Swiss-Prot record:
Coiled coil: none annotated. InterPro entries: FA_synthesis (IPR003664), Phospholipid_synth_PlsX-like (IPR012281). It catalyses: a fatty acyl-[ACP] + phosphate = an acyl phosphate + holo-[ACP]. Catalyzes the reversible formation of acyl-phosphate (acyl-PO(4)) from acyl-[acyl-carrier-protein] (acyl-ACP). This enzyme utilizes acyl-ACP as fatty acyl donor, but not acyl-CoA. Belongs to the PlsX family. This is Phosphate acyltransferase. It comes from the Bacteria. Keywords: Cytoplasm, Lipid biosynthesis, Lipid metabolism, Phospholipid biosynthesis, Phospholipid metabolism, Transferase. Transmembrane segments: none annotated. SUPFAM superfamilies: Isocitrate/Isopropylmalate dehydrogenase-like.
């Protein structure tokens, strides 16, 4: 198996090199087929490497970039005015073929705009989508779009379904993964005209289309893939994150209420730790910008080292399993059938 090279936007995210550099070092130690290009100000990267008793080598290359995209910077300004940013240079490395994938915890809008401008979309794909994994009672489900496209057509949702199914099939080695369309009800008569039309297209496609699913079906694990527009997807994501935090806060408060509940908390501690591990959002960090001519993975901006490692591993898995080719092949098949 050939080696995989991942370009890392060192300066992206809330914690920048204090997270991205040590996470890269740990991933290199765990994955012998992985090479890393750290992109950012050379002096900052060198200092962080020294702090972790590491340095450049055959599998760890430093590429200087003089600019940084701020987390609140307008995507258009980042695209036009920051051509030597760590984010832009990392994406350029994918475009040139020096890297197989790019990982960034930076500004989502700037990352999507820059990646789309530099890499372009795959043939037959109108718009890239953000695909992220969400926990379920039986494992996890892939949900897309998570916010890249607020307004979608039925054809866009069909393309999202194809891309999501191919990603799950390739990375998780699931034959014929099931695809659900997020709606306000399971019945065919439910939803707006765009969603109804999307259901028809998905049903007529070669995909294993389950039908309409509701929000609670995501967490029940009813389907392997859940398709929706970016507005609905982002609201779903933020609501689920808020719910998880609320449950954690309420549980802590209840167990600290009096001495009896504190004792109960100590008894339940092993179960609570297992519960926390299973729902730990760090385990699911790394949303893929699907539909581009290159693998680009977006880490959560507040990710710690453990979470950022998962984002790097997500990028590596997609390259190893040739996700881009699978998506391209399926889109071409759809176009031949339509013709």
């Amino acid at each position: 198996m050939r080696n995989i090279t991942v370009a890392i936007d060192v300066m992206g995210g809330d914690h920048g090199p204090h997270v991205t550099v040590p996470a890269a070092i740990r991933c290199l130690a765990r994955h012998p087929d992985l090479n890393v290009i750290l992109v950012g100000p050379q002096d900052i990267i060198a200092a962080e490497l020294r702090a972790h008793r590491s340095g450049p080598g055959p599998r760890l290359i430093v590429r200087h970039a003089s600019q940084v995209v701020a987390m609140d910077e307008a995507p258009a300004l980042a695209l036009r005015g920051k051509k030597d940013s760590s984010m832009r240079v990392a994406i350029d490395l994918v475009k040139s073929g020096e890297a197989d994938a790019c990982v960034s915890a930076g500004n989502t809008g700037a990352l999507m705009a820059t990646a789309r401008f530099v890499l372009k979309t795959l043939p037959g794909i109108d718009r890239p989508a953000i695909a992220a994994v969400m926990p379920t009672v039986s494992g996890h489900a892939l949900v897309l779009d998570m916010g890249a496209n607020v307004d979608c057509t039925a054809e866009h949702l069909l393309q999202f379904g194809i891309m999501g199914a191919m990603l799950v099939s390739a990375v998780e080695h699931k034959q014929n993964p099931s695809v659900g369309l997020l709606n306000v009800g399971e019945e065919d008569i439910k939803g707006n005209e765009m969603v109804k039309r999307a259901a028809e297209l998905l049903r007529d496609s070669h995909l294993n289309f389950y039908g309409n699913v509701e929000g609670n079906d995501i967490f029940k694990g009813t389907t392997d893939v859940v398709v929706c527009d970016g507005f609905v997807g982002n609201v779903t994501l933020k609501a689920s994150e808020g719910l998880a935090k609320m449950i954690s806060t309420v549980l802590k408060a209840e167990f600290k209420r009096n001495w009896l509940t504190r004792i109960a908390g100590l008894i339940a501690l092993p179960v609570l730790k297992a519960f926390k591990r299973r729902l730990d959002p760090r385990r699911y960090n790394g949303a893929t910008l699907l539909g581009l001519k290159g693998v680009v993975v977006k880490s959560h901006g507040s990710a710690d080292r453990y979470a950022f490692e998962h984002a790097i591993e997500t990028a590596g898995d997609e390259v190893r399993n040739n996700v881009l080719k699978r998506i391209t092949d399926q889109i071409q098949l759809l176009q031949r059938v339509a013709a």
